[in-house]
């Protein structure tokens, strides 16, 4: 049996799609020193190569890819989107606007100076900012008819221009951002690692590289005369053992009877007490607890230690500092803080926002009690609420179909903005109603990434057919324009953050990378700073930047 692979691929879009995905993801895993292409650029390069060989892809497949991607972006942004205007949020919003407005202005100027074809400037800007949402917004404005092409301009040519501009510029945008993130602080004789350590010391944040997360352990001790002398007749509230050591007295056996003590309890000689705390907290106990008086009693030690992920929901908690929760007062222990999928340093001064996830451990009933005060315990389920997912997806498309007329001008949202709005709404409702619209984070990540990569396949295949011709005509112009659009907005944002907003450099660099929605650069900067402190800034700008980048793509193609 003879199989003509070339013919098979040209006749079967689904097979072609997954062949390009597989080859691209394989290339993405190749490392050159510490540099790795990443899945998006790996798939894009493969698709460009296959496109240059004459393979094509249906437009409908491309559309479903970008629709899924942008809808999932909205769901992820939903819980934190409205909190961006709280506290430091205005600073983060300003940085995003500086990057975006300067990038749009420079894109128009370079497009005019280099006489770039219609759509090429927009694609170049999307790549230079490593912002796929810009490309999504622009392509959707064309597909939906929101953007009316000038007379004599070919639709397919413009779509190819968008793809080629993005493909040429992406690598320039990524590498220049990583280099600037390292270089700009050094020009001021500042070190990212020192800046991160400064924030850590000022705010009492442990080093992410050194901090290890343990479950609390239970140990029991018999109260002797030495311990009675140490307590000096004070009750548990006055002793404040949990404030001094981090341990919490969960249970007491007195005269054979087990009891859960309150703050008024006074220890007596012969009591047996069970304490819950981290291993190092037990080590900080006064020696009068430990000197030969440890007790091994199954009933006394039979406490159910639970670890749960609590989602911040309640209005009286959102906007408070982490330290105001006083988790230790409830006998609970904080292990992790996650915001917008970014693990944050455990900073007691951090302001909580709806949708934040706190990983808390402690005795099961106490963890559930504190969860009711904060919000709700995240559902540990592998089942997605596909009804809500599909319903809001439909609503997003319907929002995009709504148009308004002003005289002879007709304006509408388009699918991209419509799906963003519906996605944000679903994400916001999910953060406030634990049983509604639940999608496991792993499923959401896979859907978003698959949608993005399918979109990349479509871009590469459509642009690849003329890639050599494009490069010979406009390649150097696009690369020069991309370098300008990538570098100058970052420098402007850095100057605003450093001299007007007076931001710590580690936070500032993280915020700029978030404003550029560039995850790969964030990983490199965290490694360079030897800290996750920059992630605080990244989480502050990332959600709002994703939304505004999509709108910017629509604006660019409308005004081009």
Curated annotation (Swiss-Prot):
One of its GO terms (cellular component) is plasma membrane. Coiled coil: none annotated. SUPFAM superfamilies: TrkA C-terminal domain-like. Residues 203-292, 293-376 form the RCK C-terminal domain. Keywords: Cell membrane, Membrane, Repeat, Transmembrane, Transmembrane helix, Transport. It is a multi-pass membrane protein. It is found in: Cell membrane. The keyword Cell membrane applies. One of its GO terms (molecular function) is monoatomic cation transmembrane transporter activity. Its main location: membrane. Belongs to the AAE transporter (TC 2.A.81) family. YbjL subfamily. PANTHER family: K(+)_H(+) ANTIPORTER SUBUNIT KHTT (PTHR30445), TRANSPORT PROTEIN YBJL-RELATED (PTHR30445:SF10). This is Putative transport protein VSAL_I2029. The lineage of its organism: Bacteria, Pseudomonadati, Pseudomonadota, Gammaproteobacteria, Vibrionales.
């Amino acid at each position: 049996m003879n199989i003509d692979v070339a013919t098979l691929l040209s006749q079967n879009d689904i097979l072609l799609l997954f062949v390009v995905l597989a080859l691209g993801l394989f290339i993405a895993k190749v490392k050159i020193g510490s540099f790795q292409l990443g899945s998006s650029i790996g798939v894009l390069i493969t698709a460009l190569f296959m496109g240059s060989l004459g393979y094509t892809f249906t437009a409908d497949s491309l559309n479903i890819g970008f629709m899924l991607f942008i809808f999932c972006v909205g769901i992820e942004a939903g819980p934190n989107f409205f909190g961006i205007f709280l506290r430091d949020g205005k600073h983060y919003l300003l940085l995003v606007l500086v990057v975006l407005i300067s990038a749009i202005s420079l894109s128009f100027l370079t497009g005019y100076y280099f006489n770039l074809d219609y759509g090429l400037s927009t694609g170049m800007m999307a790549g230079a900012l490593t912002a796929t949402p810009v490309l999504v917004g622009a392509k959707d404005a064309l597909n939906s008819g929101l953007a009316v092409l000038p007379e004599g301009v070919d639709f397919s040519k413009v779509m190819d221009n968008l793809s080629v501009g993005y493909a040429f510029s992406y690598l320039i945008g990524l590498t220049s951002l990583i280099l600037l993130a390292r270089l700009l602080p050094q020009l001021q004789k500042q070190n990212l690692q020192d800046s991160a350590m400064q924030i850590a010391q000022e705010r009492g944040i442990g080093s992410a590289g050194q901090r290890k997360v343990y479950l609390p352990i239970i140990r029991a001790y018999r109260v002797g005369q030495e311990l009675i002398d140490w307590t000096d007749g004070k009750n548990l509230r006055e002793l404040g053992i949990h404030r001094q050591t981090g341990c919490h007295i969960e249970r007491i056996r007195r005269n054979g009877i087990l009891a859960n003590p309150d703050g008024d309890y006074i220890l007596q000689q012969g009591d047996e007490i069970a304490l819950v705390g981290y291993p190092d907290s037990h080590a900080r106990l006064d020696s009068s607890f430990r000197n030969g008086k440890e007790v091994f009693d199954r009933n006394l030690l039979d406490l159910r230690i639970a670890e749960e992920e609590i989602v911040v929901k309640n209005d009286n908690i959102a906007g408070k500092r982490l330290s105001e929760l006083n988790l230790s007062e409830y006998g609970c222990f904080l292990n992790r803080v996650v915001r917008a999928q970014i693990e944050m340093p455990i900073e007691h001064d951090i302001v909580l926002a709806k949708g934040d996830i706190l990983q808390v451990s402690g005795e099961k009933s106490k963890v559930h009690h504190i969860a009711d005060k904060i919000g709700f315990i995240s559902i540990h389920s592998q089942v997605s609420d596909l009804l809500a997912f599909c319903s809001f997806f439909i609503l997003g498309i319907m929002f995009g179909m709504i148009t308004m007329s002003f005289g002879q001008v007709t304006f509408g949202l388009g699918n991209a903005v419509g799906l963003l709005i519906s996605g944000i709404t679903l994400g916001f409702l999910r953060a406030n109603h634990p049983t509604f619209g639940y999608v496991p984070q792993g499923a959401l990540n896979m859907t978003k990434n698959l949608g993005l990569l399918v979109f990349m396949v479509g871009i590469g295949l459509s642009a690849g057919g003329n890639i050599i011709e494009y490069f010979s005509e406009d390649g150097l112009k696009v690369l020069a324009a991309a370098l300008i659009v990538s570098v100058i907005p970052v420098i402007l944002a850095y100057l605003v953050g450093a001299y007007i907003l007076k931001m710590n450099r580690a936070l500032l660099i993280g915020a700029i990378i978030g404003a550029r929605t560039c995850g790969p650069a964030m990983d490199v900067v965290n490694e360079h700073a030897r800290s996750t402190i920059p992630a605080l800034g990244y989480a502050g700008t990332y959600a709002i930047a994703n939304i505004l980048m999509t709108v910017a793509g629509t604006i660019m193609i409308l005004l081009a």
